[in-house]
Amino acid sequence: MSSIEQVNEVFDTILVLDFGSQYSHLITRRLREFNIYAEMLPCTQKIADLHFKPKGVIMSGGPYSVYAEDAPHVDHAIFDLGVPILGICYGMQELAWINGKQVARGEKREYGPATLNVLDKEDALFKNVDHSTVWMSHGDKLHGLPTGFKVIATSDNSPYCGIVHESKQIYGIQFHPEVTHSSNGKTLLKNFAVDLCHAKQNWTMKNFIGTEVQRIRDLVGPTAEVIGAVSGGVDSTVASKLMTEAIGDRFHAILVDNGVLRLNEAATVKKTLVDGLGINLTVVDAADEFLDNLKGVTDPEKKRKIIGNTFIHVFEREAEKIKPKDGKAIEFLLQGTLYPDVIESISFKGPSQTIKTHHNVGGLLENMKLKLIEPLRELFKDEVRELGELLGISHELVWRHPFPGPGIAIRVLGEVTREQVEIARKADHIYIEEIRKAGLYDKISQAFACLLPVKSVGVMGDQRTYEQVIALRAIETTDFMTADWYPFEHSFLRKVASRIVNEVDGVARVTYDITSKPPATVEWE
């Protein structure tokens, strides 16, 4: 075990073993809502390789059949840990398969709500859960009780809705308590973690700050220095502030102005980070370099790669100018990785298919021989926002809408020129300004304007015009995996469109995108 304590060694941890369910991450989120630290690992995790002992284990659902030849299976060593275990859906079927192969294909798939009937009213898992609505989503079923188990809950269509081992705290449930459709599902998960596993409810961002600051100091040491890229977004700002709290001016933040940032972004970020938060920041104006490299490029993937490669080149060049006080080279690179990024990479079947190339600084590690430091890698976005406010970062910045790494370059459809960027930038500024004036900014998850690669006939004064088209986008979402368009009042859209056409030269028409995700993505490119 490392001498530097990890989060799962400091806080009581519920281990969630992922069998591939689309709901698996929700188990972790629900437990954290009760201030219980939960961590997800692939179901194939070797228990001998764990560097911590969990207080309990939850086996998630999954899209497979336990009896299939290529079905994933858990390391049987989890049963030697001596901690409570809860199998959900596929996880329950895994328990049944291990203990007598009591699983078969159902006559029909059961998907939707069911009413839970608890037989053992004294069982701690089902305290305050009886006769509630639960959510079913399974095609296989138990055709008999696993060896050593008894039934403790049923539903109209499932005689084995809940089972428990006769002498051990090993539970199986056929439904999904982690989804909101299960009315008392969160209560059941809390019962498991608190009443059965006796996990302490001390996972708070206030406690995390002290733990993480000390961990950073132990990791970096008394003299080493750290560099990191900042964008003005919440993730990089919170990570930078946390690093500054830990090691002061031995952290060097670099903001690369790539020419496709929001209006007045570089100046705003500098004022916020340096004057407001005391972060050691260098601003690099590389707009010409980026825009020159983007000349003639229309393919969105090529844009992303050009911006990513140019960023690495500029960042490396600026980092070489930093001379650490101890005379040694920079050792560490800060990155604002969040827990959803970690979750996406842990699947035993491999990460999900790439839809878009993500703009990050991964290439810097290999090129500059840096060690990666990720202080936010255990946190969900809502936890990062809470952490940011505790660190004294303004509400406005903490709740700022996401902005893509490639910036306005992927909001100018087609070739990116200085003129096109300026049109999109000004239109976006007007749009966001009006959203704020209307008191809607915090109700909307993300909003932006993009410039379409088409022209449209218009009339300005007595003159016929033939100019460009702006598309407005605004969405509501909880996780950015799915999203719906925001239903503005027509009067609001009329006002925004009027301002853009009258105040931004080169625009003849404004449209509003009413496509949900899926089928569309949030960004146009």
UniProtKB/Swiss-Prot annotation:
ATP binds at residues 231-237. The keyword ATP-binding applies. GO terms for molecular function: ATP binding; GMP synthase (glutamine-hydrolyzing) activity; GMP synthase activity. Its main location: cytoplasm. GO terms for biological process: GMP biosynthetic process. It comes from the Eukaryota. Its cofactor is Mg(2+). XMP binds at residues 304, 462, 517, 523. Keywords: ATP-binding, Cytoplasm, Glutamine amidotransferase, GMP biosynthesis, Ligase, Magnesium, Nucleotide-binding, Purine biosynthesis. Its EC number is 6.3.5.2. It is found in: Cytoplasm, Cytosol. Pathway: Purine metabolism; GMP biosynthesis; GMP from XMP (L-Gln route): step 1/1. Residues 203-400 form the GMPS ATP-PPase domain. It is an enzyme of class 6 (ligase). It catalyses: XMP + L-glutamine + ATP + H2O = GMP + L-glutamate + AMP + diphosphate + 2 H(+). Catalyzes the conversion of xanthine monophosphate (XMP) to GMP in the presence of glutamine and ATP through an adenyl-XMP intermediate. Homodimer. This is GMP synthase [glutamine-hydrolyzing]. The lineage of its organism: Eukaryota, Fungi, Dikarya, Ascomycota, Saccharomycotina.
